[in-house]
Amino acid sequence: MFVGKLTQNHAQDMGNNMLKKNIFYFFFILFIFILDRVSKLWIISIFNSENNLEIKISSFINLNLIWNKGIAFGLFSYGEKFEYNLLTGLIIMIISIVFWMIIKTKGLEKYGFLMILGGALGNIFDRLYYSAVPDFIDIYYKNFHWFVFNVADIFITVGVLMLIINEITIKNHK
């Protein structure tokens, strides 16, 4: 009887810990999504009210609102509705795969996928709401400008880097 009770309590503790972790993961994703939304709403309001073409932040960062109908860095920007809808559908499928990967992974890899999902949800929201993603961070050096991006893109990029680092670390330990 005592062993059965101990096992039952252990199972309850494990269930409670898993619930706490899942709640944390949910709020982690929600934080990324909200941070991205707030930054985009802020930049849209500035550019709508000021009609500025560019705001200089420093000698290497500008704010410059660009409506991106493609994917990362403006790639695959299509003017046709069919191609845009096809691309949006593919992105939603990829988001579903990332969600599944979060369930299946742990550690650094899980946090990489959580960051990717948070950023991807921010960008897919914009694609569905605005039919484009507002990009606004312009990093440059002299006449060389990197692709204009947003906060969601930062989290997606950091998440991918975490996955790469995790993969390299695992391969080096084998």
Q: For the regions a protein language model found, what residue spans apply to each?
A:
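Alpha-helical transmembrane bundles and membrane-interface segments of multipass inner-membrane proteins
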Residues: 2-174
